A protein has these predicted regions:
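Active-site-proximal cofactor/substrate-binding loop regions of enzyme domains
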Residues: 59-70, 74-76, 81-83, 93, ...
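Cap/lid segment of the alpha/beta-hydrolase catalytic domain
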Residues: 3-72, 120-122, 128
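A catalytic-pocket lid/entrance helix-loop region that shapes and gates access to the active site
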Residues: 84, 88-130
């Protein structure tokens, strides 16, 4: 969190299967905190410090939505949650976005799957929106 927490701030969320304790996520969280954001790196269900079983792509829709809803409702959050990341961390953004949360304001998916026809969050090249 930024040093100045006198007012609620926007949140940047990373949901990862790659271990949120890795230097890359720590460095990104520090960078965004220095820019005035609250940065959160969350291990996906069943990965590293998270409980449960990891089933790729299965829980990302609802777990992403639940995380965004929880973050957005915290008193230290201004009601704005954004997501950023690449690879799996990018793809889970699309999945979370398909279940609309009023708190999710932006996603920045990078280096994501290119087979949109058979993708877990697209059906016949059209986005699954619900």
């Amino acid at each position: 969190m930024p040093k100045d927490r006198s007012k609620p701030l926007p949140v940047i969320l990373f949901r990862t299967p790659y271990n949120n304790d890795e230097d890359r996520f720590i460095d990104l969280c520090i960078f965004f905190a220095q820019q005035g954001y609250i940065a959160v790196a969350q291990d996906l269900r069943g990965r590293y410090d998270s409980e449960g079983q990891f089933y790729p792509w299965v829980n990302e829709y609802n777990d992403g939505y639940d995380t965004i809803e929880w973050l957005g409702s915290q008193p230290w959050c201004d009601g704005s949650v954004g997501m950023i990341g690449r690879s799996y961390v990018g793809n889970v953004q699309w999945q979370a976005a398909t279940i609309s949360s009023s708190y999710l304001k932006a996603i920045v998916p990078r280096v994501i799957g290119d087979d949109l026809y058979r993708s877990p969050h697209y059906q016949g090249s059209a986005s699954r929106l619900g």
